Amino acid sequence: MLFNKEKHWPKPVLGFCAYSGTGKTTLLSQLIPIFKGQGIKVGVIKHAHHEFEMDRKGKDSFRFREAGAGEVLLASSRRWVLLHENEVQAEPDPGELLNKMDLDHLDLVLVEGFKHHQLPKIELHRPSLGRNRLHPDLPGIIAVASDEPLLEEELPCLDLNQPQMMVDFIRSWMEKD
């Protein structure tokens, strides 16, 4: 399933795919404040290939999970977080994760990872790393962002060193979609 705001989702969803160490997190961390400065509220879904722990041993929420709670919602006046324990270890589905987000408070969802899922996405490519391109083997790639000019490219090419250019491209894509 290819996510877009008209057919499957009320808000635009755009993925970023690349090999580990290419700079996906760095790029998204540059794009988000530009969007925010333009009044666009951004949510992010990040795929982790490894175990992670947001909780700390000894804290009440950790103790509740350790005791067997399937979900623990931790809330304060500034933020809240829902810790959910998966009963079955399986790759998460981005569509199911999107259902968990409060889209009434977002204008755009950026997805880091999930490169094999049918999301519209921008490929990050750094030729100096010596890795093969993901396009055309991966579905849904709508543009490529690189730190070097790419020859004979059929997709729109974006400069990784120009985050404002990337924001402009994404805003144009949001309006078309």
Features from the language model and the residues they span:
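Walker A (P-loop) phosphate-binding motif
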Residues: 2-50
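Hydrophobic/aromatic beta-strand patches that form the interior of the parallel beta-sheet core
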Residues: 14, 43-45, 70-73, 122, ...
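Conserved nucleotide-binding/hydrolysis micro-motifs of P-loop NTPases
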Residues: 49-50, 79, 115-117, 129, ...
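Phosphate-binding/switch loop-helix module in NTP-utilizing enzymes
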Residues: 85-114
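Short, hydrophobic beta-strand segments that form beta-sheet elements in well-ordered domains
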Residues: 109-111, 121-125, 140-147
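Conserved C-terminal guanine-recognition region of P-loop GTPase G domains, centered on the G4
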Residues: 115-137
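Conserved NTP phosphate-binding and transfer environment spanning the P-loop NTPase/kinase superfamily
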Residues: 116, 137-177
